[in-house]
Amino acid sequence: MATNGHFASLGGDSSDKTAYEHGVQVIDENKEFNPNLSKYLSIEDVTPAGFNYHLISVFGSQSTGKSTLLNHLFGTRFSVMSELERRQTTKGIWMSKNKNTEGSMASNILVMDVEGTDGRERGEDQDFERKSALFALATSEVLIVNIWEHQVGLYQGANMGLLKTVFEVNLQLFLKDKNTTHRSLLFFVIRDFVGMTPLKNLQKTLMEDMSRLWDSISKPAGLEKSTVHDYFDFQFYGLPHKGYQPEQFVAETKKLSLRFREGHKDPSLDAQKGEFSDGGVFLPEYHRRIPADGFSRYAEGIWDQIVNNKDLDLPTQQELLAQFRCDEILREVMVAFDEAIVPFEDKQSQAARLGEPEILGGLGAAMRTARAKAVKSFETEASRYHKGVYQRKRAELESKIDTRLKALFQGQLNATHKSGINEFSDAVTTAVKSGQKKGTGYDFAEIVSEEVKKAMEKFEEVARTTTVEGTSWSDYSQELALYEKELAEVSARLRRDEMRRLATRVERWVQSRLGESVGLEFNALGSGRAGGGAPETGDKPTEKKFWDRVWNVFVETVLDAERRFTDRASSFDASLEEVDVGLWRLRRKSWGVLRAKIDEEMIEGNLLLKLRENFEDKFRYDDAGVPRIWRPTDDIEGVYTRARESTLTLIPLLSKFKLSETSAPPPLDRWVGHTPSSATAADEEDLPPIGGVDEEEGKSLEEEMTILSDSKRQELIVRFKKAADGVYVEAKRSAIGGMTQVPLYFYGILLALGWNEIIAVLRNPAYFFLLFVCAVAAYVTYQLNLWGPILKMTEAASNQALAEGKKRLREFLESSDTGRQAIAMSASGSEQHEMSRLNKQGKAAASDEDGDDL
C-alpha cells in the first residue's frame, strides 16, 4: 500500500474529492500545518455542522496497529504498516471523517491518527511527541490509548511517559483558563486481549499507574490534592488478536464502534472504585465548543502557538478564532445586506443631488427584512463562538446596519417632509382657485384644516411603514413635530397671502365704487343750473357741500368694504391681529384710491372743462333750465357776470378738501387709526405715506388735503376767464346777428324779376302742388330743428361720393394700360401723391406734406 507521503501530496495540492479519500494530513513530519484542512472539511460536509461533530485522537507506540484499529472502527483508509517491513507508516498527524455507515454511531466523527511514539526515526527527539499530544488534547474529546495486553504494567511499553505528558499539558491548559475544567476521555483499547487476565484487573493496574503518574507531576498551588479523576474520565475495552482471531477481532471492533455515540454520565458510577461506563463516549463536557466552520482556523492557531513554544492559551485562541470568524461572517452578512439596501441608497442620493425629494416605495419592508435577515444570519453562524466576542461583534454589526438604515430613514422622512410641504401648498392653492372659479365661495380655514390632516396622515403613514422595530432611531416624534410646525408656518403664510389677495380684491372693489361714485359727484359740477345758491334739500344739491358728499361716499364705501373683508376673513380662521392689520391697510389703500381719483378729476384739462360746462349751464340756461335765445334787449353782460362769478367760487372750493360743517379737513388721521402693534415691515413697505397720519412724512393734514396749489389755482382762473369770455363773445354776436334785416327794395326787385315764374307756378297745378309740398316740408323741418342734421348729412354724403369717385378713378388708372402709362409719365421728375390725399385744388394735403417731413 502507498505511504502517507503520497496522501499528503494529494491532500495538499488537489481539490478533487478523490484526493482526500485517505484523509488529509493535518500536520506533516516537518511540523507544517496543512492550509487545506478547511477545504477537506467542506468536501466532507462537516463545515455546516456547527457543534454537531466529534473529534477523536489515537495515541500509542509506533507500529502497534493504531491506523488498523481506526480503519476497522470508522471505515477510514489510513495507511497501515506492511507486515514485511517494520518501519514508520504514519507521519505527523492525519485526519479522516468516519466512513462507517452504522446508523447508531454519532454523525460527523473526525478521527486523528497521531504519529506513534518511541519510533526509531525520531529516536531521542521527543519534541514532536509532546507537541502532538498537546495539540490532540487541545482539540480532541476522546483520546484512544492503543496498548497491547502484555504492555500493561510497563512504563515505556504502556506509554506512561506520553500519558504523563498529557497530564502535564492538561494542567497547563487549566492554569490558563481556571474558569473551565477541560475534561477529556482516556479510552484504553487493550489489543491482543486473550482473557487470561480479567479486564477488571487490567483496569485496576492501569488506574493505579494513572494515579501514580498524576501524583508524580508538579501541581500548582491549590491543586495539590486534586486527583486524575477531576480532569479525566476513563473507559476500557479489550480486543482479540487480529492475526490469530480475525473473525473475533472484526466482531469486537464492530461492537466497539457502537460505543462512539452521544452518551450521558451515570452519577451512580464511582471511577475510584473501578466502576466505569460502557455506554456512549461523547459527553457534552468533552466538546471543545469550537464550531466546525472555525475548526481549521482554531487548529492552525493552536498549532502555531505549540510549534513556536508559546504557552498555549485556549481561551485566547478561542477569542482569536471568534474574532476572525465573526469578522468573516460579518463581511458575508453585509454583502447580502448591501444587495438589498444599496439600490435604495443610490436612489435617495440621486434624488438629493437633483433636489427632487422622492419617497422610496417599499423602503420600510426592505429595511426590516434586510436587518432581520442580517442579524439572524450572523446570530446563526457566530453565536457558536466565544460569547463575549460574539456579543461585541453583533453589536458592531447592528451599529453598522443601523447607521446606514438611520440615514435612509432620515432621508425618507426629509423627502416626505419636503414633498408633503409642496403638495400641501399646491393642494390649498388648487382648492382656493377651484372655489373661485365655481363662484360658490369657499372656506379657506376648512380647506387648510383638511389638507393639514391629509399631510399629517401621509407623513405618519410613511414614517410608520419605514420604522424598524427595536431600534432607537425609529422614533420619529421629533420629525413629526417639526413637520407639523412647518405646516403651521406654511398655513399662516398661505393665509397671509390669501388675505393679501382678499385685500386686493376688496381694494379693486373700492376703486371701482369710488371711481363711479366720486366721478358722478365731479360730473355734477358740470351742471350748474341750480347755481351756488341751490337749496339744501331736493334733487339739486348745493355745490358748497361737494366735499361733504365725497367724504360721505368714501366713508360709506370703505365701511362696506370693511364688512366684506371681515366677513371673508372669518372663513380664513384669521386672528384678530391679522384682521386689524388688514383693515388698517384697507383704509390706507382706500384713501390712496380716493386721492388718485380726485387728482384724476382735478387734472387741469378735466377741471377746466367742468368749469366751462358749469358756466355755460348757468349762462345759456335760465333758472328753470330753459335755453336762452339772446336778443339785443337782453342783459347779456349781467347774466355773464353772475354766471362767471358763481363758477369762479368753485375754484377755491375745489382747491382744498374741507367739510362745510366744520370748515376743516375731514378727520383722516382718526379715521385711518394708529399702526397696529402686530403690523410688520412687510405690511407697511407697499403703503404710500399719508400727510397728517405718518409723522415721518413731514406733511400736515392741511397739506394732505390741499388739492390745488395757489399757482395752479391762479392759472386755472385765467384760463377759465378766457374760455368764459369766448362764450360771452359768441352770445353777443348771435344777438347782434339777429338784428340784421333784408331791405324792402330787395323784395320789390325779387317780385319784379320773378313775376313770370310766379305766374307760371300759380297757373300750373303740378308746380303749385310741388311748391306747396316743399313749403310744408320746410316748415315741418324747421319746427323739428332738423335743418342742421340734414345739412350735415348732405355734406357727409357729398364728401363720401367724392372719396368714392377718387377711389374708382385710381383703380381705373391702375388697372388699364393707358392709365398706367399716364401715371408713369407724371411720376418722372415729380412727386407722387395718393389721390385720396389731394385737395380741391389738386395739390397735396397738408397732412401728406407733414408725413413726408417725418
From Swiss-Prot:
Its main location: endoplasmic reticulum. Its EC number is 3.6.5.-. Residues 682-695 have a biased composition (Acidic residues). GO terms for molecular function: GTP binding; GTPase activity. It is an enzyme of class 3 (hydrolase). The chain crosses the membrane at residues 742-762, 766-786. Residues 763-765 are lumenal. Residues 474-500, 695-715 form a coiled coil. The keyword Transmembrane helix applies. GO terms for cellular component: endoplasmic reticulum membrane. Residues 50-299 form the GB1/RHD3-type G domain. Keywords: Coiled coil, Endoplasmic reticulum, GTP-binding, Hydrolase, Membrane, Nucleotide-binding, Transmembrane, Transmembrane helix. GTP binds at G60, S61, Q62, S63, T64, G65, K66, S67. InterPro entries: G_GB1_RHD3_dom (IPR030386), P-loop_NTPase (IPR027417), RHD3/Sey1 (IPR008803), Sey1/RHD3-like_3HB (IPR046758). One of its GO terms (biological process) is endoplasmic reticulum membrane fusion. Residues 1-741, 787-854 are cytoplasmic. Cooperates with the reticulon proteins and tubule-shaping DP1 family proteins to generate and maintain the structure of the tubular endoplasmic reticulum network. Has GTPase activity, which is required for its function in ER organization. This is Protein sey1. It comes from Aspergillus terreus (strain NIH 2624 / FGSC A1156). The gene is sey1.
